């Protein structure tokens, strides 16, 4: 299959992923990287495999984008020095940008929302979080929506 055909059929996957992760800054750069990766993936895709081309591209591009985020976070370590320090020879404290944003998010949330977010980031499923917090699944979903709303309102 020619790449033009693949592109015409599946370019919306790239837009969907960029929207899913709220990419607005450097949108074009991420789009270009994902487009190059789509071309590479179209070259190695085997039509005889059980997975459809669209799900193959979506899965691989999603993980590739996550890898790009991880690489970027490793490069964006910030050195924070105390304001009172007369010299920079003291031991600096390292934080990465992700940790700093997470601290900002936690300041916005109430106790139940912070606990939900902590458990969610640790990889627990919604029903597991409901059991741990002794709440109904519908309450957990409301907490999730509240956290999402607060994050979007304050960080977009």
Swiss-Prot record:
Keyword DNA-binding in annotation: yes
Pfam families cross-referenced by the UniProt entry: Sigma70_r2
Function (record text): Sigma factors are initiation factors that promote the attachment of RNA polymerase to specific initiation sites and are then released. Sigma-S contributes to the protection against external stress, thus playing a role in cellular fitness and survival.
Sequence motif Polymerase core binding, location on chain: 29-44
Name of this protein: RNA polymerase sigma factor SigS
Residue ranges of DNA binding: 126-145
Keyword flag Transcription: yes
GO MF term (any one): sigma factor activity
Alphabetic keyword roster: DNA-binding, Sigma factor, Transcription, Transcription regulation
GO biological process: DNA-templated transcription initiation
Family, as annotated: Belongs to the sigma-70 factor family.
InterPro entries assigned: RNA_pol_sigma-70_dom, RNA_pol_sigma70_r2, RNA_pol_sigma_r2, Sig_transdc_resp-reg_C-effctor, WH-like_DNA-bd_sf
Higher taxonomy: Bacteria, Bacillati, Bacillota, Bacilli, Bacillales
């Amino acid at each position: 299959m020619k790449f033009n055909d693949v592109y015409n059929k599946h370019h919306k996957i790239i837009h969907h992923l960029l929207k899913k992760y709220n990419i607005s800054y450097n949108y074009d750069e991420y789009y270009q990287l994902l487009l190059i990766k789509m071309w590479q993936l179209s070259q190695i895709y085997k039509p005889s495999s059980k997975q459809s081309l669209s799900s193959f591209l979506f899965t691989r591009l999603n993980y590739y984008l996550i890898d790009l985020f991880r690489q970027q976070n490793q490069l964006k370590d910030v050195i924070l020095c105390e304001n009172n320090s007369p010299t920079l020879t003291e031991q600096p404290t390292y934080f990465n940008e992700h940790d700093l944003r997470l601290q900002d998010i936690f300041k916005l949330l109430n106790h139940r929302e912070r606990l939900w977010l902590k458990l969610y980031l640790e990889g627990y499923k919604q029903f597991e979080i409901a059991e741990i917090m002794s709440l109904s699944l519908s309450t957990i979903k409301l907490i999730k929506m509240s956290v999402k709303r607060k994050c979007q309102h304050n960080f977009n």
